[in-house]
Amino acid sequence: MQIDDQHTSVYDFVTDGTPTDVVARYASLKTQALHADYGDLDRNIVVIDTETTGVSERKDELTQIAAARLERGEITEWFVTFVNPGKPIPDEISHLTNIFDTDVADAPTPVEACEQLARFVGDATLVAHNAAFDRHFVTKNAGGACLKENLWIDSLDLARIALPRLKSHRLIDLVHAFDAPISTHRADADVEALCAVYRILLAAVSDMPNDLVEYISKLAPIEEWSTGAVFALIAAQQREHATSAAGEKAETFPFSLSAMRRGRFSQANQPKPASENTAPNAQSEDLPMEFPAAEEIEAAFSPDGLVGSLYNDFEPRDEQVVMAKEVLKAFSTSTNLVVEAGTGVGKSMAYLLPSALGALRSGSRIGVATKTNALLDQIVYKELPLLKSTLAEAGVGDLSYVALKGFSHYPCMRKVSHIVSDGARMVNVTGKDVSQAPSIAALLSYIEQTEYDDMDGLKLDYRVLPRYSITTTSRECLKRKCPFFGPQCFVHGLRKRAESANVLVTNHSLFFCDLAAEGFLLPPTRYWVVDEAHGAEAEARRALAVKLDAAEIVRLAHRLAATDAKRNPFVRLERRAPMNEATMPEASSLFYGLTEKAAKAGRAFSGDAIAFSHHMKDLVVCDTNRQNRNYENIELWINDEVRTSQQFAGLREYGRKFQESAEKLVAAASELVAFLEGVDGVADVQRDVATVVIDAKGMLQACDLILNKVDENYVYAAKLSRKPERVAECLEALIVNIGATLDETLYEKTHSVVYASATIAVGDDFKNFLGAMGLGETEESRANTCMLGSSYDFDKNMQVLVLTDIPEPNQPGYLETLEDFLMQAHLAQNGSMLTLFTNRREMEECFGAVDPSLKEAGLRLVCQKWGVSTKGLRDDFLKDEHLSLFALKSFWEGFDAPGATLKGVVIPKLPFAKPTDPLSCERAVRDSSAWSHYTLPQAVIEVKQAAGRLIRSQTDSGTLVLADKRLVTKGYGRVFLRSLPSKNIVKCTRAEAIEALRRGVVGSAIQ
């Protein structure tokens, strides 16, 4: 293994928004590791890694073991052996590890290899990356069983805890982040790499705050979490150093969550507040804004203008200027706008510039809502910082901006404080007892290294530490009664910043949830840009839905049935006993009476709630669609036929009992909440009881709407699981006409809403989107439209091939013909192809048929199977120029693979919504032309999104293959083809398409 000569910066490997002092801390670790002495953690260490035939602990076996003895950072001895697993090594494993059957043919058996390893290790401390995996495979047979007695340190735990702001904690990424030897994913190479980063990880732990290290060291005994020994030894070292420096013995470092959080906001780390003349205030939001002139916007997009000066390779784009001026016009005239701007227009800067200038000049605020986190991060961490810098240099003003997501994206300090008090416990995950200690440690370290960033990038296993135990909801939040309210609180501290920001960036979910919460979640904002707007209708419908979630019902039921104070607020309240019986006998008697009454109501509710949620699953038998029989999860339209069924009648009866219990619970708990008002020392538990009231009331209202009423404004659906042991049922009431709701809740409260996307129109027609979003129905909802083509030459760079001789999807021989075509197409193009399926079963059947032929030709094909990491597939696809991918919905949009990585996209079947989809069924009953009014336009938009995966830069080129014959045989085929970004469309046979792919010349005529 060779050292990488190229210097890499830690900055490139940390998550966006990481505080500068934390980046500096990370950057110093390599130097610290060179000179430090870590005592027993640095002596008699054996670093180990294994390779196996797979990840199944029961079925798979070892193929290689590598270990190196490490003394103060120096490798003194090696142990490396192949292992004969007694079974063939799967091809995908061989590709990953570069270990083949021929390598292991004459190697020792697993027992023999582990015996040799045990002799090599002796009594040394073992270090491994994801140690539980390696420990299992080397100790599961008699040869290595004795190694269970050794101390095992998990370097992955160390990395996640000490370096929580890194984007990834994979060994290869740690190697790159700290400029260590490059791993080749063989066990011996990985061991050498881990040897190089091990002391850096120890340095990272040593650099953590002393009190936090000490707290982590006491989270769990060594038997439950052996890696905790590292924190115990380093805590002892830190105490010794503190003793030496102070001259007095340091017994311990008491941990304070509040003090740790305050430390993050010391004066040195405080961001500059928005200047007084530009900071929005409550009154300014209702006043007209002052916007720049159109000429000023046009000048800004010239090569020497505000935007042009931001980029070294800036090229003026007419479409970008037109869009910016249209956004300006919409804002300055208080009208709404719908704009489709093709790929390459630069639409985000086209709306950010007029937004920023208007907000700065008016002391007001403009909001931006995105569908994906990728675009949100691009705006907040790339484009707005650039814009802020250039506006400041030009003397325009100090632009302030804040990104804000929902409550569930941020840790709740109050709940985290409960976790700190309770400590770690063992929990069962898929049959194994696992300690919560490493998850709690990583969470606390992340909080210490974070100002207000969300925890979406934090690598926590929420089966071990449930997300609801870390985050709060708008209902649960104590607000001003919380001891952490103010700057220490992630949500309210960030919201306070948002109130004084010129630009507020959020996601579609919170944007529409704020409507449902009547403006409680976001600061008042009268001007909005909704980007990626093609997904806005569906997100609005999800946000405004009324739900009965079985998992939430069961969770509340279990809380109220629990006998421990940690989970049951009534038990906790009774044990806290705020009333002194001796001095306040009457009040004390009333308190205990009300508490017992509420607790009794809670126990009764628990039984009825569990029964009700359990019987939701009875509705599975109402699904008469044969095609759904092999699916684990189904979605059922609750129509009149279902409502008159025996199963629904039974469920309604259980629902009636549930409602009666819920009403009694609400009444008893409400009395208790009222009694506790003004009582000292019970604010947190009072809020917990109030949350029970709010949750139960919400369930009551949902139950009444879904079970007892049929409101024509809603479509009713049931999401069901066929697995008896799985609690995943959810009854929903979804608004049919979301546009009418938006007309009443959004447009009346805003001056202007701009909807933008690369895919909104069907052909050149915005009618479907306007209707879906309720635009143009009233004076407040009036809207203009703007269609802008791509700044890229799609006609030149994208060739569209429409197959004419493939059977239609419902005809005999379709799948076999498709499989043969896909095999030939991949061979002709030499890989680099993305095939986008609408059906998992068809995708997996095609993969099984196509993959063997491609393997013989030396081409890799991967498939988005159950349990496969989407991120892993994306990363793998981008790294391997010839890799091809079979994928589902998550790859139809938001997946960028510029350059030669992606040369072809195949769409085997048009993405029409399932005819059994509850919304489609309801629309079909109400509208005889529902398919053409709703299903067809949505499918067109999805195809446009998929086509956009192919051309992501000026120099990209490739071929889009539409393998659905209905584009030729059905009248609606013209609607799809007219809507594509490229007009270079050729109808051809499969053989002609294969020849075109083989030539690989985009735009060449088919002979």
Where are these regions (language model features)?
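Signature of the SF2 helicase/ATPase Hel1-core->accessory helical subdomain module
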Residues: 351, 357, 374-377, 381, ...
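Acidic two-metal-ion nuclease catalytic site recognized across multiple nuclease folds
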Residues: 2-37, 199-296
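Conserved non-catalytic scaffold segment of RNase H-like nuclease domains
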Residues: 2-151, 164-185
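Acidic, Mg2+-coordinating catalytic module of metal-dependent nucleases/exonucleases
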Residues: 122-142, 161-237, 962
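Conserved RecA-like P-loop NTPase helicase motor core
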Residues: 791, 799, 803-813, 865-968
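A substrate-engagement module of RecA-like helicase motors
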Residues: 271-287, 294-298, 303-308, 370-502, ...
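Conserved pre-motif I regulatory segment
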Residues: 291-338
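A contiguous, basic/glycine-rich beta-loop/short-helix subdomain that forms a polymer-engagement track
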Residues: 468-502, 512-513, 517-519, 658-806, ...
